[in-house]
């Protein structure tokens, strides 16, 4: 997949989606689309449509953003050192579209101890009941 040009993305994405994914922004905590979503399904990159996270791995970390213990496929995620805002963190980006997604922290509950803290604006949620219809039928097995 070739990443769309900036002008195409400005037409396709909402202002907050563009700010987060293309300008490495952060949406407000607790005031975002998927923070409280509990429905089963997958979360895909809002730019490329690549599957990134599953509701099976989502949990309430109390931080105000959707949090996951792991990605669906680690090969779709790129981690980079982020030294912005006078901190050292690990930024999470999508491999194909190079979208800024959020950050990963070593304080999660899963076996790997990681918390993927992801901006809702970087994601599109596909409910379990609509996976096949939306072209993601191969991911139905995650919910068996």
From Swiss-Prot:
It catalyses: L-methionyl-[protein] + [thioredoxin]-disulfide + H2O = L-methionyl-(R)-S-oxide-[protein] + [thioredoxin]-dithiol. GO terms for cellular component: cytoplasm. Its EC number is 1.8.4.12. GO terms for molecular function: peptide-methionine (R)-S-oxide reductase activity. SUPFAM superfamilies: Mss4-like. It is an enzyme of class 1 (oxidoreductase). InterPro entries: Met_Sox_Rdtase_MsrB (IPR028427), Met_Sox_Rdtase_MsrB_dom (IPR002579), Mss4-like_sf (IPR011057). PANTHER family: METHIONINE SULFOXIDE REDUCTASE, PEPTIDE METHIONINE SULFOXIDE REDUCTASE MSRA_MSRB. NCBIfam families: peptide-methionine (R)-S-oxide reductase MsrB. This is Peptide methionine sulfoxide reductase MsrB. The gene is msrB.
């Amino acid at each position: 997949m070739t990443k769309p040009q900036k002008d195409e993305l400005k037409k396709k994405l909402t202002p907050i989606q563009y700010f987060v994914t293309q300008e490495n922004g952060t949406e407000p905590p607790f005031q975002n689309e998927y923070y409280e979503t509990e429905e089963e399904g997958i979360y895909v990159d809002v730019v490329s449509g690549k599957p990134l996270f599953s509701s099976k791995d989502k949990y309430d970390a109390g931080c105000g953003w959707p949090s996951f213990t792991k990605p669906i496929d680690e090969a779709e995620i790129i981690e980079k050192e982020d030294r912005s805002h006078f901190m050292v963190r690990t930024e999470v980006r999508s491999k194909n579209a190079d979208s800024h997604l959020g950050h990963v922290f070593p304080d999660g509950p899963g076996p790997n101890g990681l918390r993927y803290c992801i901006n809702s604006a970087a994601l599109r949620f596909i409910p379990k009941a609509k996976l096949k219809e939306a072209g993601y039928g191969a991911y139905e097995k995650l919910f068996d």
